Amino acid sequence: MMTISLIWGIAVLVSCCIWFIVGIRRRKAGEPPLENGLIPYLGCALKFGSNPLEFLRANQRKHGHVFTCKLMGKYVHFITNSLSYHKVLCHGKYFDWKKFHYTTSAKAFGHRSIDPNDGNTTENINNTFTKTLQGDALCSLSEAMMQNLQSVMRPPGLPKSKSNAWVTEGMYAFCYRVMFEAGYLTLFGRDISKTDTQKALILNNLDNFKQFDQVFPALVAGLPIHLFKTAHKAREKLAEGLKHKNLCVRDQVSELIRLRMFLNDTLSTFDDMEKAKTHLAILWASQANTIPATFWSLFQMIRSPEAMKAASEEVSGALQSAGQELSSGGSAIYLDQVQLNDLPVLDSIIKEALRLSSASLNIRTAKEDFTLHLEDGSYNIRKDDMIALYPQLMHLDPEIYPDPLTFKYDRYLDESGKAKTTFYSNGNKLKCFYMPFGSGATICPGRLFAVQEIKQFLILMLSCFELEFVESQVKCPPLDQSRAGLGILPPLHDIEFKYKLKH
């Protein structure tokens, strides 16, 4: 027994030595400082995952503004100087921004690659998104969202006894329920043959979405979904409802989904379930960050009396100018694109809420060896290495945003009450100062719609409801760090609030 243990011990020791000699990457001349970590393959992943912000700050103090970390077998160059962000974007010809995102999508949602280079489809999906989420298409999408929000918030035929009563609910649960149902109907339409059971079906989809989304960080990290039986079953149920045979019988399906259905049928070799899973990816992208962003915007607005007053006055003025009535009854409220865009206070509230809660990781993959020229110097980058920006470092930098952990509803307003677009770091004007939606070629194509639907939600909450926290001195809930890198962080726990319809 002792001999066997000794042999195993020697084998492990030899393996570790071989890994140390062969497996550890060595820093070459001109490359950024390197952190390999102590654990094979994982490298620094556990430290990074436990608290990305503090991990990056610690390495920034140790190495300066540019350094390399091994994460899950990949070498990631972190650029932490906000003055260099725009310089990274200028090197676009050396980056493959699609590779990481397409691989992640296939891994999480269970379809084959949507990269045209892999031969499964010839669709340029980024062009599809741009065509159907911006410009004229945004008008019809926003109009549908406003109608669906009002249908969900103010269901027709509500008994007067219920409309007069205060309702107590978790604010995050409320935002989740309202935004999911309205967003689902806006993108995928409604089944007119199942009007009576429509709400129950969507709420069932909501439960499945929560189950799937709960394990999403693990899927992105590389764990197979088969390890999570409940989430796997939930994903398959969601996809089943998004098969083309089911979407074809729905009314008011968005232009985005109708175009994607056509392109999937004509340009891809995907089977029916894979096509449905590409639609599931759109559902996730439309909900996973918008829901927590909506919560933080509402929470921070109600928590700040100054923000509440300024927003209420702005919304009231906009509705009156548009000839709309500020009440819960009567005709539906509607503001067009020009009117929605002319709400600087709501814009600033949303931006400030997202600044405090966003923790996205902007990633690009090097297509070849090249030299990256930044404000801090030039660095040699190897092919297949990743370049990463972590904008939370900038969003919480006191040099750029004084008192960065405090919500200031007018932080993005200038002295004249218009949108503020000038921010500085070390006396230098920043070209990039607000990045919750990504940057450059990887910027979220649906960002304009996301902001508009949050704005519409806030308009309806202010115009239709009386709003109060259950606790008068409510504290800000901590952020759920388990989703760091994916976008907007949800609250670690919910906050109780109460609401009732205005009369």
Swiss-Prot record:
Name of the protein described by the UniProt record: Cytochrome P450 7A1
Biological role: A cytochrome P450 monooxygenase involved in the metabolism of endogenous cholesterol and its oxygenated derivatives (oxysterols). Mechanistically, uses molecular oxygen inserting one oxygen atom into a substrate, and reducing the second into a water molecule, with two electrons provided by NADPH via cytochrome P450 reductase (CPR; NADPH-ferrihemoprotein reductase). Functions as a critical regulatory enzyme of bile acid biosynthesis and cholesterol homeostasis.
Gene induction: Up-regulated by dietary cholesterol and cholestyramine. Down-regulated by dietary bile acids, such as chenodeoxycholic acid and cholic acid.
Chief place where the protein resides: endoplasmic reticulum
Keywords from the UniProt entry: Cholesterol metabolism, Endoplasmic reticulum, Heme, Iron, Lipid metabolism, Membrane, Metal-binding, Microsome, Monooxygenase, Oxidoreductase, Steroid metabolism, Sterol metabolism, Transmembrane, Transmembrane helix
UniProt entry tagged with the keyword Heme: yes
Transmembrane segments annotated in the record for this chain: 4-24
UniProt-listed GO biological process terms: bile acid biosynthetic process; cellular response to cholesterol; cellular response to glucose stimulus; cholesterol catabolic process; cholesterol homeostasis; negative regulation of collagen biosynthetic process; negative regulation of fatty acid biosynthetic process; positive regulation of cholesterol biosynthetic process
Cofactor: heme
EC top class named in words: oxidoreductase
Keyword Transcription regulation carried by entry: no
Catalysis performed (reactions): cholesterol + reduced [NADPH--hemoprotein reductase] + O2 = 7alpha-hydroxycholesterol + oxidized [NADPH--hemoprotein reductase] + H2O + H(+); 4beta-hydroxycholesterol + reduced [NADPH--hemoprotein reductase] + O2 = 4beta,7alpha-dihydroxycholesterol + oxidized [NADPH--hemoprotein reductase] + H2O + H(+); lathosterol + reduced [NADPH--hemoprotein reductase] + O2 = 7alpha,8alpha-epoxy-5alpha-cholestan-3beta-ol + oxidized [NADPH--hemoprotein reductase] + H2O + H(+); lathosterol + reduced [NADPH--hemoprotein reductase] + O2 = 5alpha-cholestan-7-oxo-3beta-ol + oxidized [NADPH--hemoprotein reductase] + H2O + H(+)
Residues annotated for heme binding in this entry: 444
Cellular location(s): Endoplasmic reticulum membrane; Microsome membrane
Family the UniProt entry places it in: Belongs to the cytochrome P450 family.
Tissue: Detected in liver (at protein level). Liver.
GO molecular function: 24S-hydroxycholesterol 7-alpha-hydroxylase activity; cholesterol 7-alpha-monooxygenase activity; heme binding; iron ion binding
Listed EC numbers: 1.14.14.26, 1.14.14.23
